[in-house]
A protein has these predicted regions:
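C-terminal active-site/capping subdomain that shapes the small-molecule cofactor and substrate pocket
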Residues: 91-192
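Conserved anion/nucleotide-ligand pocket segment
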Residues: 1-60
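Short low-complexity stretches enriched in small and charged residues
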Residues: 34-44, 69-76, 127-131, 137-141
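Glycine-rich, charged/polar anion/phosphate-binding loops
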Residues: 49-50, 66-71, 100-103, 159
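Oxyanion-binding "anion nests"
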Residues: 54-96
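Generic secondary-structure signature for well-ordered alpha-helical cores
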Residues: 2-11, 65-68, 72, 106-109, ...
Length: 192
């Protein structure tokens, strides 16, 4: 990540993931490996062709808190952005996610996006529970707002999940929906 070269294609995690929480204040647990669940692939819910834009987003709950403040991105920032969203370890419900997405539509940003990337839900939820988030994304984005061409990828390895990839805010990225590839096409750092 600290290279001036573009990051390149990001591949789904194949090593597994965990919801196990250890008390890191206990020195004995600091070296203990957590139990991993089998890897689950990213889910490409909709979209065709290739889209490019800047990475913009973060924790859904925090973004919702920022709406209406000076820290909320300017309207122009949403144009063609690849919005990445993830939920916190508090595991907000799919209904909450739907309400926030509807609010994003009401403030005029949802229909400006190039794509939606959704991280594996945070908290200690079972993998079967993750599908409800896919359904609410489809319901709001596709059925309610008619954005059936907006690429949506879910179950990605970022956010309040372990292990997690880091998405550099504001850099250019590309989705190839036909090849199911996610590429960060710009370096997150500049040479001095």
């Amino acid at each position: 990540m600290f290279s001036s070269e573009p990051i390149g294609t990001i591949h789904p995690n194949t090593d597994g993931w965990t919801t196990e929480v250890l008390d890191w204040s206990n020195p004995e647990l600091q070296q203990q490996r957590r139990t991993l669940r089998p890897s689950s692939s990213w889910r490409w819910l909709q979209g065709q062709g290739t889209v490019s834009g800047s990475l913009l987003g973060g924790c859904l709950e925090v973004l919702d808190w920022l709406r209406g403040t000076p820290y909320w991105p300017e309207q122009a920032a949403w144009k063609d952005a690849l919005l990445f969203l993830e939920t916190s370890e508090e595991a907000p419900s799919p209904d909450y996610v739907g309400r926030v997405l509807r609010t994003f539509a009401a403030v005029g940003m949802l229909d400006q996006l190039g794509a939606v990337l959704f991280g594996r839900p945070g908290g200690t939820q079972e993998p079967e529970q993750h599908l409800a988030y896919d359904e609410i994304l489809r319901q709001v984005i596709t059925e309610e707002y008619g954005l059936g061409n907006l690429p949506i990828i879910t179950n990605m390895d970022f956010g309040h999940t372990d292990p997690m990839m880091v998405l550099p805010y504001g850099v250019q990225a590309q989705l190839d929906c036909d090849r199911k590839e996610f590429t960060i096409t710009e370096s997150p750092v500049a040479e001095r």
